[in-house]
């Protein structure tokens, strides 16, 4: 019928806007604020853990960090990031379209976009910290929270055993 609204995304009383009109930074911030998996992953992070974030479709610097076990994502440059991410819009959409996923599924999606060949889907990683600092900041706890799903995915990519993390880190440092 004319004037009748049939979807929640067009309903003016709906609390959510359609994701196709939101910028990557807003989508990612909302994801971290509402996703149980994002909160669970951030709970492993320690004081000082930080990620510098840039988007290929949004200008400016952003930072991700945890405070009191809760994820925070805001505009500004990370002071001493453990690593920096440059995230394409396709990767943002893939991650944020799964708010109900668990930490394992979220981790696999993240890693799939690190190895993606398509620039519109890619997450580029520039690692600044070594294994000791990453461990002290809780990043291995985040990996462990992904459990068998992430470990299985890594094994399929040839990263097996205790040296898998060190091998993956060395690949990221080389770029």
Task: List each language-model region with its residue ranges.
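Feature captures hydrophobic
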Residues: 2-175
């Amino acid at each position: 019928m004319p004037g009748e609204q049939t979807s929640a995304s067009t309903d003016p009383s709906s609390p959510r806007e359609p994701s196709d009109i939101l910028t990557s930074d807003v989508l990612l911030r909302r994801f971290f604020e509402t996703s149980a998996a994002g909160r669970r992953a951030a709970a492993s992070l320690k004081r000082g853990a930080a990620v510098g974030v840039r988007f290929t479709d949004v200008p400016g610097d952003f930072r991700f960090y945890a405070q009191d076990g809760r994820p925070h994502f805001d505009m500004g440059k990370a002071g001493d990031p453990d690593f920096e991410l440059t995230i394409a819009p396709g990767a943002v959409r893939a991650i944020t379209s799964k708010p109900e996923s668990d930490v394992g599924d979220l981790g696999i999606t993240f890693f799939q976009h690190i190895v993606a060949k398509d620039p519109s889907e890619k997450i580029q990683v520039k690692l600044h910290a070594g294994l000791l600092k990453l461990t002290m900041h809780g990043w291995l706890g985040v990996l462990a929270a992904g459990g068998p799903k992430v470990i299985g995915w890594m094994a399929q990519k040839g990263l097996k055993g205790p040296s898998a993390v060190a091998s993956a880190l060395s690949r990221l440092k080389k770029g």
